[in-house]
Amino acid sequence: MLILPIAVLCPVVLNTDVLIIGGGPAGSYLARYLVKNHFNGDVTLIDKRSVIYAPVICGELLPSEDLLRPWINKELYGVLLTTLRETLHKEFIVNNIKELNIIINDRVAATMPFRTYLIDKGALIRNIVEEAVNYGAKVRFGTTALKCVGKDNEYECVVHDRQSGEYAIRTKVIVGADAYPSIIDLSLGITNGFNPEDLIIATSARAFGKYDEDKAVIIMDPDLAPGGFAWIFPRGDGIHNIGVGVRNNVAWIGNNPLNYHEEFTRRFGLKQLQRSVLMKTIPVGGLANRYGTDNAYLIGDAVGSVIPTNGAGINPAMITAHLLGESMIHGTNYTKLMNRVFKPLMDRMVLFRRVGDPLLMNRKAMERAMKLSSRLMVSSIYDATLSSMKLSTLIKFLLGYPLIRLIS
């Protein structure tokens, strides 16, 4: 008779006060925030990746401190500034971007000021994780959460560790920071999820190309990136971060994201460093209908923090982590804090994205709009790219709405 070790027959149960699933920008930032601010309890972070932090599926673009100051509300800007100053050290900046080229249907429509940084996201995340560990957090990479359930006013998650196999972690507070859809949300049914038209399938790769080293490029062409846009972000050494964002409701109809990506690289003279193309699903429908329930919370992409008009994800994820951390440290309400600080911007950006959707999905409509008023089109795109909360931007979109419907 084969006698199995007790560890195999009886899953090991680890106990913690806070379990954070996902070690990306949101999860790592929250772990660091809690332990640095003397949270009363153990903080454990797990991530399915075996390497801290790879692979990177991201444009890796962050705003300079002053870029968004005129465009967003003061309280939100204060949180953004905190996330930048606490995480973005000089050694993580790969390249300084000065301008943005906006290409619409193969033509350069405008070149606008765009003080941003191309960063080494992997190095930035590794540093945040290391700081979290130094402050007292427990971190386990190579550990995948399989399912989580409520149990005796706490939560129990079955996880799989590449070295130890399956075991359970018991926790008082559980946080889903594992992108969309989160295993926490799937297990506990916290949100209603997002409709296909509110999701983007984004590709990511690095490529050689003959483009200015201080100019980011976004390409809005519904034949190339229906419902989204393509991007070329220079790293400063002749290599560029590139990708295509395609709306999920059309991504697999007749074509697929990889085909769109290949056409994009061919048309814009880009030669990839590797043949492989990474992909991920990104929510662009604004914040989820709920952010948590009964000490189970969602942050980052899991709660829908990606900016709907530009796909920015790193700092918005950290903003949600900061707000949850603040609520846990000070005993305030995470939902109320999110609704006050972050939701107004997200709701406004969803509105702008939906107003522009008919153009993003129809090349001929995009052409007609450019012929009618290229100046209004370009300024609206630029404002939306900067997440503008200015009244003038709202007026542009409200005035443009009936015109867009008419020409579409």
Regions flagged by a language model, labelled:
Residues 49-99:
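N-terminal FAD cofactor-binding segment of flavoenzymes
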Residues 2-15:
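A short, basic/flexible loop-to-alpha-helix module at the beginning of a structural domain
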Residues 111-130, 249-256:
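Short beta-strand to alpha-helix junction loop
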Residues 12-26:
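Beta1/beta-strand and adjacent pyrophosphate-binding region of the FAD-binding site
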Residues 147, 248-324, 333:
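FAD/FMN-dependent oxidoreductases across multiple families
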Residues 35-57:
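Glycine-rich FAD pyrophosphate-binding loop
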Residues 326-408:
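C-terminal helical "tail/cap" subdomain of flavin- and related membrane-associated enzymes
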